[in-house]
Amino acid sequence: MSGMRAVRLLAVVALGMALVACAARPPFTVVKVTLSDFKYSSKVIEIPAGQKVGFEMTNVGTTEHDVMIHMGGFHYLIQPGATVRRNVGPLPAGEYQVQCTIPGHKELGMSATLVVR
C-alpha cells in the first residue's frame, strides 16, 4: 500500500511542477512578416510591450530582401524562398521604423512601422 501512495504522491508532485513551469513562462507573441517584391505584408506591425516576440520572416519574392528595425541589432538578409526566425525583446513601448536597406527597395515601398504598446 505504501508503494502505491508513493506513486500517487510522485504523480501529484510532477503535475504540480509541470503547472508551475508553464505558469512561469512569460507571454510570447509570434509575428509573421512576408516579404515580396517590393513590400512587406503589413505597413503597420503591432506587438505588445514588455513581451518577447518571435519574428518569422519569409521572402516570397524573386529578389533578396532584408529587414532592419531601427532599434539596434535587428538586421537580417533573407534570400528568395527562405524563412528566418528570430526572437527579440521585450521591447519598450514606442514606434520603430522597419525597412529593407538594399539600395532602392525602401523607395519602392519596402518600409513599415513597428508599434509597441
Model-derived regions: residue spans:
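N-terminal edge beta-strand
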Residues: 27-50
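Asparagine-centered strand-capping/turn motif at beta-strand->loop junctions
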Residues: 57-59
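C-terminal motif of bacterial Sec signal peptides marking the signal peptidase cleavage site
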Residues: 18-21
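Bacterial signal peptide processing site
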Residues: 23-25
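Beta-strand-rich interaction surfaces with strong enrichment in secreted/lumenal proteins
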Residues: 42-45, 73-77, 86-88
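Short beta-strand/loop motifs in extracellular/secreted proteins, especially
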Residues: 53, 63-65
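Bacterial N-terminal signal peptides that target proteins for export
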Residues: 1-11
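Extracellular/periplasmic metallocenter environments
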Residues: 80-117
